Amino acid sequence: MGNTTSERVSGERHGAKAARAEGGGHGPGKEHKIMVGSTDDPSVFSLPDSKLPGDKEFVPWQQDLDDSVKPTQQARPTVIRWSEGGKEVFISGSFNNWSTKIPLIKSHNDFVAILDLPEGEHQYKFFVDGQWVHDPSEPVVTSQLGTINNLIHVKKSDFEVFDALKLDSMESSETSCRDLSSSPPGPYGQEMYVFRSEERFKSPPILPPHLLQVILNKDTNISCDPALLPEPNHVMLNHLYALSTKDSVMVLSATHRYKKKYVTTLLYKPI
């Protein structure tokens, strides 16, 4: 009896295994997904369309990151000129991906535009009165589509002089601002300056001090010609001097400059 029971239990187990084995071949169109993982099969949780961590899942993001790391080239102001006539002139090129037409401003007989172009080679073409044309007087190149375009090469060396002038102007402006903002030298304190009465109402001198040094009043050196006077100061020029009246004669003098020479004229008038 005991052997019969054990054989029956064993037969039931074999029947269950056989049923599971037969259930695996239901049809070619049905596919069972295993929900319980096994350490022996690393692809248990991998669906047919899933990607492994090593696949190119984030390639576009990585490309954008690489592009952002690249240094951007400095834009340089470039003059574009069209001198072949026309009523309306536009320009377009590889610098704006040929997306828009930039108008040129008429200046006398030419059309001019100043564009900020990055360093390197750029192809461009003019749109004159509704037709695409190129300037025959400028360098040309044939594009991949077989069209003839103008070619311009923007180089950093062409703008070194302008960069130096700009840097010098910035340094001079900073220096001038620093000089204007700096305080004058001298001791500083908390006491306010009090004006005295004689300082407040003191009038300026009748004659500036530098005009008191009249060259006609100076003694001439013995070794010099009496007709030659010492070189006057520039503040003495174009002023009228008068000598004190003596023997009923009035004497007037004035000094003028002619290029590198000075001439002093004396006028005598009896009164």
Swiss-Prot record:
Pfam family name, one: AMPKBI
Top-level taxon in the UniProt lineage: Eukaryota
Record-listed Phosphoserine modification sites: 38, 68, 94, 107, 157, 169, 173, 183
Keyword line: Fatty acid biosynthesis, Fatty acid metabolism, Lipid biosynthesis, Lipid metabolism, Phosphoprotein
Gene Ontology terms describing biological process: cellular response to nutrient levels; fatty acid biosynthetic process; positive regulation of cold-induced thermogenesis; signal transduction
Span of the signal peptide: none
Disordered: region residues: 1-47
SUPFAM superfamilies: AMPKBI-like (SSF160219), E set domains (SSF81296)
Annotated GO MF terms: enzyme binding; protein kinase binding
CDD domains for this protein: E_set_AMPKbeta_like_N
Residues with the Phosphothreonine modification: 39, 147
InterPro entries, sorted: AMPK1_CBM, ASC_dom, ASC_dom_sf, CRP1_MDG1_kinase, Ig-like_fold, Ig_E-set
GO CC terms: apical plasma membrane; cAMP-dependent protein kinase complex; cytoplasm; nucleoplasm; nucleotide-activated protein kinase complex; nucleus
Post-translational modification note: Phosphorylated when associated with the catalytic subunit (PRKAA1 or PRKAA2). Phosphorylated by ULK1 and ULK2; leading to negatively regulate AMPK activity and suggesting the existence of a regulatory feedback loop between ULK1, ULK2 and AMPK.
Keyword set includes Transferase: no
Family the UniProt entry places it in: Belongs to the 5'-AMP-activated protein kinase beta subunit family.
Annotated function: Non-catalytic subunit of AMP-activated protein kinase (AMPK), an energy sensor protein kinase that plays a key role in regulating cellular energy metabolism. In response to reduction of intracellular ATP levels, AMPK activates energy-producing pathways and inhibits energy-consuming processes: inhibits protein, carbohydrate and lipid biosynthesis, as well as cell growth and proliferation. AMPK acts via direct phosphorylation of metabolic enzymes, and by longer-term effects via phosphorylation of transcription regulators.
Known partners and oligomeric status: AMPK is a heterotrimer of an alpha catalytic subunit (PRKAA1 or PRKAA2), a beta (PRKAB1 or PRKAB2) and a gamma non-catalytic subunits (PRKAG1, PRKAG2 or PRKAG3).
The name this protein goes by in its record: 5'-AMP-activated protein kinase subunit beta-2
Gene behind this protein: Prkab2
